[in-house]
From Swiss-Prot:
This is Triosephosphate isomerase. It is found in: Cytoplasm. It catalyses: D-glyceraldehyde 3-phosphate = dihydroxyacetone phosphate. PANTHER family: TRIOSEPHOSPHATE ISOMERASE. Substrate binds at residues 9-11, 171, 204, 225-226. InterPro entries: Aldolase_TIM, TIM_sf, TrioseP_Isoase_bac/euk, Triosephosphate_isomerase, Triosephosphate_isomerase_AS. It comes from Picosynechococcus sp. (strain ATCC 27264 / PCC 7002 / PR-6). The gene is tpiA. One of its GO terms (cellular component) is cytosol.
């Protein structure tokens, strides 16, 4: 049975005060009849402690946006798995395209971060996807398959979420056609040894397209950026029809 996971990635948004205001608005709007859907908020590191306390006893799980592969050490600006688990974090995003593009993360370091997450009992959300140039060149499958092959070396697929995020659709307002997203996610599933891995779609998921996206048979959830920053829009995604 594949788990449905709707995860918000707040990126570098929301102070602690803003996070509390968001939760106060969100929690009453999440329908109780959708308890089989896992709801995750991946917040900035500065929000994790407060959010952990505030989310206790709710159906929302706490996620982080990155993890270092070392358990400790002289790695200025990084955060370890034990630091995250101490905060009550359950999920962690690994290999987001913004990390790969702006901070030089490679498939090798993504693999190391995945291993660190699993070593500490965290469920990693592995992001894979192609650029506009790669899609236009007909390289979508080759790019994604290469990422999967390198990223998943010695990774336990029983504790893994994959997010297909076409880079050209992130924050642009351009959404990958739902049927095309379903096709690509189906190809990703074929490459996995565990066919029950939750595979999300990420890329301009909004209240006006979430129903069509989630109606696709291969899509098990969404990794949401901008639409997760407003309580009303994120609640609409969680409560998709």
């Amino acid at each position: 049975m594949r788990k449905i996971i709707i995860a918000g990635n707040w990126k570098m948004y929301k102070t602690q005060a803003e996070s509390l205001d968001f939760l106060k608005a969100l929690l009453p709007k999440i329908a109780d009849d959708h308890e089989e859907r896992e709801v995750v908020l991946c917040t900035p590191f500065t929000d994790l402690g407060l959010m952990s306390k505030s989310l206790h006893g709710t159906r929302v799980r706490l996620g982080a946006q990155n993890i270092h592969w070392a358990d400790e050490g002289a790695f200025t600006g990084e955060i370890s798995g034990s630091m995250l688990t101490e905060m009550g974090v359950r999920y962690v995003i690994v290999g987001h395209s913004e990390r790969r593009q702006y901070f030089g993360e490679t498939d090798e370091t993504v693999n190391q971060r995945l291993k660190a997450a699993q070593r500490h009992g965290l469920t990693p959300i592995l992001c894979v996807g192609e650029s506009k140039a790669q899609r236009d060149a007909g390289e979508t499958e080759a790019v994604i398959f290469a990422q999967l092959e390198q990223d998943l070396v010695d990774i336990d697929q029983n504790n893994l979420v994959v997010a297909y995020e076409p880079i050209w659709a992130i924050g642009t307002g351009d959404t990958c056609d739902a049927t095309e997203a379903n096709r690509v996610i189906g190809l990703i599933r074929e490459k996995l040894t565990n066919k029950n891995v939750t595979i999300q779609y990420g890329g301009s998921v909004k209240p006006n397209n979430v129903d069509e996206i989630m109606a696709q048979p291969e899509i098990d959830g969404a990794l949401v950026g901008g639409a997760s920053l407003e309580a009303e829009s994120f609640a609409r995604l969680v409560n998709y029809v």
